[in-house]
């Protein structure tokens, strides 16, 4: 079906708030671009690159009355009456799949490859995770996902239980299973993420070892040898009491979705119960790991 595209230009600092505003008025998807048209393939809420000049692009159903949409947006404090925007009709495309040509097999660490399900694996003898992210987040293209995958690849997961807190596409949980974990548990607030994780687990032959839960459905008590949470700095701080009880004594914790500038505040929330390793940075993002005391 055809779509209507609404484009706003803003600062990187305001991009997330305006993306929320577009979703509230009916946008079915959001894309972020800098002024040089560099796409963000994995725009997790809060994980946008902080470009100085950012386009926020919303797609709307072709039947949407855009006059009503604009009228509502004019009341937003970051926009105001007569805000600058561009609306255009788009031809019928599969917008959710348009990026597929740019998604190639990627290696993380020594053993692990993440391969799009529509491409051939470059090394059949490697640990290959075949991935189709669908509508969920997590392809390995984002630095935070990459940091988590590299960490998992460096662990001895044989026979271990792993919890993926905020599982998205299931990429981290499935990678852990392919790397030798006996069992993985994925938790996410988004039903689409649960479905994408389930589909990807089936594609990789690990469905029987992956449990998936929405927060309201998860067991009261869960424990794991390894816990990885690639979400956001704010939730990582707020949910520290919940996340901290998940690893067993001596268990490992890996946290990402954190800007390097936010590392100290996140470390502070976990340092009482964990012996933390040096923070690892990639671009402006970082990974925090540690062992349960």
UniProtKB/Swiss-Prot annotation:
Top-level enzyme category: transferase
The enzyme's E.C. designation: 2.1.1.-
InterPro entries: Ribosomal_L11_MeTrfase_PrmA (IPR050078), Ribosomal_PrmA_MeTrfase (IPR004498), SAM-dependent_MTases_sf (IPR029063)
Gene3D superfamilies from the UniProt entry: Vaccinia Virus protein VP39
UniProt: S-adenosyl-L-methionine binding residues: 145, 166, 188, 230
Record SUPFAM superfamilies: S-adenosyl-L-methionine-dependent methyltransferases (SSF53335)
Keyword Membrane recorded: no
Compartment list: Cytoplasm
GO BP terms in the entry: methylation
GO terms of molecular function: protein-lysine N-methyltransferase activity
Catalytic activity: L-lysyl-[protein] + 3 S-adenosyl-L-methionine = N(6),N(6),N(6)-trimethyl-L-lysyl-[protein] + 3 S-adenosyl-L-homocysteine + 3 H(+)
Keywords: Cytoplasm, Methyltransferase, S-adenosyl-L-methionine, Transferase
GO annotations of cellular component type: cytosol
Role noted for this protein: Methylates ribosomal protein L11.
HAMAP family xref list: Methyltr_PrmA
NCBIfam families reported in the protein's UniProt record: prmA
Similarity comment: Belongs to the methyltransferase superfamily. PrmA family.
Protein name per UniProt: Ribosomal protein L11 methyltransferase
Upper taxonomic lineage: Bacteria, Pseudomonadati, Pseudomonadota, Gammaproteobacteria, Enterobacterales
């Amino acid at each position: 079906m055809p779509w209507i595209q609404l484009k706003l230009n803003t600062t990187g600092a305001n991009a997330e708030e305006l993306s929320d505003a577009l979703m509230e008025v009916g946008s079915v998807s959001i894309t972020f671009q800098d002024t040089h048209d560099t796409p963000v393939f994995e725009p997790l809420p809060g994980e946008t690159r902080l470009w100085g000049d950012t386009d926020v692009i919303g797609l709307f159903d072709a039947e949407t009355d855009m006059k009503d949409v604009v009228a509502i947006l004019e009341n937003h404090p970051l926009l105001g009456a007569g805000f600058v925007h561009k609306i255009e009709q788009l031809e019928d495309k599969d917008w959710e799949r348009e990026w597929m040509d740019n998604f190639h097999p990627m290696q993380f660490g020594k053993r692990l490859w993440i391969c799009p399900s529509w491409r051939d694996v470059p090394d059949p003898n490697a640990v290959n995770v075949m991935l189709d992210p669908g509508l969920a987040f997590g392809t390995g293209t984002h630095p935070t996902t990459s940091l988590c995958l590299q960490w998992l690849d460096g662990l001895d997961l044989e026979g271990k239980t792993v919890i993926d807190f905020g599982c998205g596409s299931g990429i981290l949980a499935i990678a852990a299973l392919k790397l030798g974990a006996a069992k993985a548990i994925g938790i996410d607030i988004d039903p689409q993420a649960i479905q994408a994780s389930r589909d990807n687990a089936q594609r990789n032959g690990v469905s029987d070892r992956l449990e998936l839960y929405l927060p309201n459905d998860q067991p009261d008590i869960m424990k794991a040898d390894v816990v990885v949470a690639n979400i956001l700095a704010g939730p990582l701080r707020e949910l520290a009491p919940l996340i901290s009880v998940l690893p067993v004594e001596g268990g490992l914790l890996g946290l990402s979705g954190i800007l390097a500038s936010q590392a100290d505040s996140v470390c502070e929330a976990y340092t009482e119960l964990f012996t933390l390793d040096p923070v690892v940075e990639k671009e402006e993002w970082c990974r925090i790991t540690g062992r349960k005391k």
